[in-house]
């Protein structure tokens, strides 16, 4: 079977990827529906966030187990913030189980405050570059899909 390579992407394998619907906020942020350990979540897709995060107040809600001690994490707008890693949890995007994912528990109140001002529903977490790179995610803006 002949395969076409374009800009380093294997077009054949792109066709066999799973797709997940995404939505755009009024400010063009990308949102997708997810489940963490079977519990529904609204997640922000953020290519600039190095790690995937969950709002620290939701640790019990998502049945997340801490792993290690609290540390200082650097945020784009909040400077240093207290954070802690979680053990890997079952992550599902759309209707596709994508495997186990560790998260950083972080206070995302400032993110939700900004989203509220912009008329957007709050998020429970952020899907960051760690997940996006590991899973070779492609963001299809025209068709409003993530290809996994």
Can you say where each PLM-predicted feature lies in the sequence?
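Pepsin/retropepsin-fold aspartyl endopeptidases
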Residues: 1-148
């Amino acid at each position: 079977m002949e395969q076409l390579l374009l800009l380093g992407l294997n077009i054949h394998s792109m066709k066999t990827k799973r797709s997940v619907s995404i939505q755009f906020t009024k400010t063009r942020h990308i949102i997708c529906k997810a489940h963490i350990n079977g519990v529904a979540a609204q997640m922000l897709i953020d290519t600039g966030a190095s790690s995937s995060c969950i709002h620290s107040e939701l640790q019990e809600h998502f049945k997340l187990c801490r792993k290690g001690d609290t540390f200082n994490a650097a945020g784009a707008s909040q400077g240093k913030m207290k954070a802690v890693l979680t053990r890997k949890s079952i992550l599902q995007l759309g209707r596709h189980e994508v495997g186990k994912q560790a998260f950083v528990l972080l206070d995302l109140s400032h993110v939700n405050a900004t989203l509220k001002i912009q008329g957007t529903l709050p998020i429970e977490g952020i899907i960051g570059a760690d997940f996006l790179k590991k899973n070779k995610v492609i963001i299809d803006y025209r068709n409003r899909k993530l290809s996994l």
